[in-house]
């Protein structure tokens, strides 16, 4: 906790090609070693493939893919009398986006295709069609929250 009051949120500039803040956040998460140009090229290639295969506007297709991965519930550990319970909690909208971006990128990196652009486009296309590793991660998170509904009264 900061001693000098709440920390202000830093805003990100919209990306130059589509004018989307969400795309900029994705590119920043994708970036390695400060190489933003490389990350942008990979991302734009992947989004073009996604738009081509989905037959929809690139921005809308990307937003739909992110929307399909956003979790609504998650579990957080809560210690009560020596026992730790997994308490289901609603996920704040900002955290939903953060988790969705993280899961998509991690699952894309874990895929077997050759080249990051192909991996990313494959994962985005799977997310667009409500399947794939990132959507499975979301469903697992929801399943955990559902299984621990009995501890919902420990919410704080």
Curated annotation (Swiss-Prot):
Gene Ontology cellular component list: small ribosomal subunit
GO molecular-function terms, A-Z: rRNA binding; structural constituent of ribosome; tRNA binding
Keyword RNA-binding part of the UniProt annotation: yes
Disulfide cross-links: none
Transmembrane segments: none
Entry-linked SUPFAM superfamilies: Ribosomal protein S7
Keywords attached to this entry: Ribonucleoprotein, Ribosomal protein, RNA-binding, rRNA-binding, tRNA-binding
InterPro entries with a match to the protein in the record: Ribosomal_uS7 (IPR000235), Ribosomal_uS7_bac/org-type (IPR005717), Ribosomal_uS7_CS (IPR020606), Ribosomal_uS7_dom (IPR023798), Ribosomal_uS7_dom_sf (IPR036823)
Listed Pfam families: Ribosomal_S7
GO BP terms, alphabetized: translation
Role noted for this protein: One of the primary rRNA binding proteins, it binds directly to 16S rRNA where it nucleates assembly of the head domain of the 30S subunit. Is located at the subunit interface close to the decoding center, probably blocks exit of the E-site tRNA.
Family label: Belongs to the universal ribosomal protein uS7 family.
Assembly and interaction partners: Part of the 30S ribosomal subunit. Contacts proteins S9 and S11.
NCBIfam families for this protein: rpsG_bact (TIGR01029)
Protein name as annotated: Small ribosomal subunit protein uS7
Organism for this UniProt entry: Solidesulfovibrio magneticus (strain ATCC 700980 / DSM 13731 / RS-1)
